[in-house]
Amino acid sequence: MGWIRGRRSRHSWEMSEFHNYNLDLKKSDFSTRWQKQRCPVVKSKCRENASPFFFCCFIAVAMGIRFIIMVTIWSAVFLNSLFNQEVQIPLTESYCGPCPKNWICYKNNCYQFFNESKNWYESQASCMSQNASLLKVYSKEDQDLLKLVKSYHWMGLVHIPTNGSWQWEDGSILSPNLLTIIEMQKGDCALYASSFKGYIENCSTPNTYICMQRTV
């Protein structure tokens, strides 16, 4: 009988230990499952909180880069049109006689702007072949369209070293206060630019040129 009671007591103790062990396993399993379930929730919330912030930063950076690119492009276009584009010249001022085809007729003068680059002597020969001469500036009033010219062009003005004067192809002397002569290079020929300015240039330097033909 004592042996039986001892066996029962040991069995009860083993069952109690087994029950406690199961409880510990269940608690441990529940804790593990709870942590596994909680972690994705926490991570998901972190991602939900972080994603809008990084998305907003990305959009802001992209818009900033686009703005810089657009400003650069428009600045380049503006500067190019400012320095290189010729202003449209009015063609309806006063009576004008017949001019060669495609020439500009303005206040009894015919003008042609040639975009090909030649030295001064070649430009002079080109104008003479068309029964014209290089540009001669003789009146700010009658030639006010020349204020609109933007780039540099050969005109028929040359420097005479013997007396230091400037004269036109026809031998007439440059009238005082008609042109402002600016020394850009060492030379004996002159380029016309905007606002009745003449720029000294070496005669052998290639430049565009203006031919002129009087109609009266």
Curated annotation (Swiss-Prot):
Any single GO CC term annotated in Swiss-Prot or TrEMBL for this entry: external side of plasma membrane
Disulfide bonds: C96-C105, C99-C110, C127-C211, C189-C203
Transmembrane segments: 52-72
Glycosylation sites: N115, N131, N163, N202
Tissue expression remark: Natural killer cells.
Residues exposed to the Extracellular side: 73-216
Protein's cellular compartments: Cell membrane
Residue span, C-type lectin domain: 98-213
Quaternary structure and interacting proteins, as annotated: Homodimer; disulfide-linked. Heterohexamer composed of two subunits of KLRK1 and four subunits of HCST/DAP10. Interacts (via transmembrane domain) with HCST/DAP10 (via transmembrane domain); the interaction is required for KLRK1 NK cell surface and induces NK cell-mediated cytotoxicity. Can form disulfide-bonded heterodimer with CD94. Interacts with CEACAM1; recruits PTPN6 that dephosphorylates VAV1.
Annotated protein name in UniProt: NKG2-D type II integral membrane protein
Species per Swiss-Prot/TrEMBL record: Pan troglodytes
